[in-house]
UniProtKB/Swiss-Prot annotation:
Chain sites annotated for binding a divalent metal cation: C121, C126, C160, C163
Cofactor(s) demanded: Fe(2+)
Protein's name in the database: 3-hydroxyanthranilate 3,4-dioxygenase
GO cellular component terms, A-Z: cytoplasm
Length: 171
């Protein structure tokens, strides 16, 4: 049976309390694609690597999408009202600010396709990969948060092998 349309302003009014750190997302529709509402502020340092594209729409306020584009670290600003399609396999870190709301649409992953969370060394002279966690993503609502908390709780995973700098899961 088809799901009824969702009135987004009404949903936000009634459910904004569901947008909790560290990811601040809530999956409102599933079925081939997952539609998430994402609030700010968030506090993450990981870069998500998704083998499928991700569609962003900034409903309220602006956000910064930190990406690694052909080996270069750069920021993409997505302003209120903007849409942006991030190609597959681009490491990205969505930075959301206080009192902002976005919608993200991701394709459900086929069996065997792995997502990854990657942390880079925070030392700008180094920027080597500190740790990467690959996993079969089945539940966007819980697995990203679990991977972040796992990284946060293990200093060995957070220590850069190249320069010794200790990374954190929050900026």
């Amino acid at each position: 049976m088809l799901q009824e349309p969702i009135n987004l302003p009404k949903w936000l009014e009634e459910n904004q309390h569901l947008l909790k750190p560290p990811v601040n997302n809530f999956c409102i529709q599933r079925g081939g694609y997952t539609v998430m509402i994402v609030g700010g502020p968030n506090a993450r340092t990981d870069y998500h690597i998704n083998q499928t594209p991700e569609w962003f729409h900034q409903k309220k306020g602006h956000m910064t999408l930190k990406v690694v584009d052909d080996g270069e670290f750069r920021d993409i600003t997505i302003n209120e009202g903007d849409i942006f399609l991030l190609p597959a396999n681009v490491p990205h870190n969505p930075v959301r600010y206080a009192d902002t709301i976005g919608v993200v649409v991701e394709q459900d992953r086929p069996e065997g396709m792995k997502d990854a969370l990657r942390w880079y060394c925070p030392n700008e002279k180094c920027r080597e990969i500190v740790f990467e966690n690959s996993f079969q993503l089945v539940d966007l609502g819980t697995q990203i948060k679990e991977a972040i908390l796992d990284f946060d709780g293990d200093i060995e995973k957070r220590t850069c092998k190249a320069c010794g700098t200790v990374a954190t899961s929050r900026p």
